[in-house]
């Protein structure tokens, strides 16, 4: 799945690791992800779409760290991201030193549901990235300019909201929400 990176997505900090590759590549990728200080480790089901997935399909363990959102990041997020990279390099024995301590005890997310908009219109989300959700809960509505509901986005499973569009404008076939299914959300540290 190819997904154009947007600057209108709100996301919680998490890390993708290669999941559609040889077992040893997946194992090494997950081990790399485990040294990143985020609440969730997300196993990617894709073998293409993004450089980290392509690397995995070529036998190269890889991860994608998601931190910051809407094209904005704080100094703290930059420092956390840099420390994450240093920890991965330490794990790989490319950089000397001990892997630094972590704030989070990450939860595994192996099944992610990606929902794209079926209509162009105005998006009204009901949740925030990092919120837990229950199957059947309304995650948001797409309305026209007159307030008529064009689409209702409903959670297909219990889980945690990884990211969502937060702009008023939403485009047909564009990303709307992504959430991890059946996650033991009680174990997730709030970021």
Predicted features and spans:
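Structured catalytic-domain cores with a bias toward divalent-metal coordination
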Residues: 1-191
């Amino acid at each position: 799945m190819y997904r154009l990176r947007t600057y209108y997505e709100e996301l919680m900090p998490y890390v993708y690791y290669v999941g559609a590759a040889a077992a040893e590549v997946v194992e090494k990728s997950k081990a790399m992800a485990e040294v990143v200080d985020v609440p969730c480790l997300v196993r990617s089901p894709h073998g293409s779409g993004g450089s980290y997935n392509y690397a995995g399909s070529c036998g190269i363990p890889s991860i994608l760290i998601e931190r910051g959102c809407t094209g904005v990041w704080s100094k703290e997020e930059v420092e956390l991201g840099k420390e994450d990279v240093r920890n991965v390099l330490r794990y790989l024995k490319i950089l000397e030193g001990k892997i630094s301590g972590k704030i989070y005890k990450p939860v595994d997310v192996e099944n992610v549901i990606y929902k794209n908009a079926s209509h162009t219109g105005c998006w009204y989300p009901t949740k925030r990235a990092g919120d837990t959700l229950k199957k059947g809960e309304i995650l948001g509505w797409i309305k026209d300019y007159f307030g008529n509901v064009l689409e209702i986005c409903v959670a297909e499973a219990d889980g945690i909201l990884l990211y969502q569009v937060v702009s008023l404008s939403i485009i047909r076939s564009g990303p709307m929400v992504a959430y991890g299914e059946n996650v033991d959300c009680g174990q997730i540290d709030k970021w």
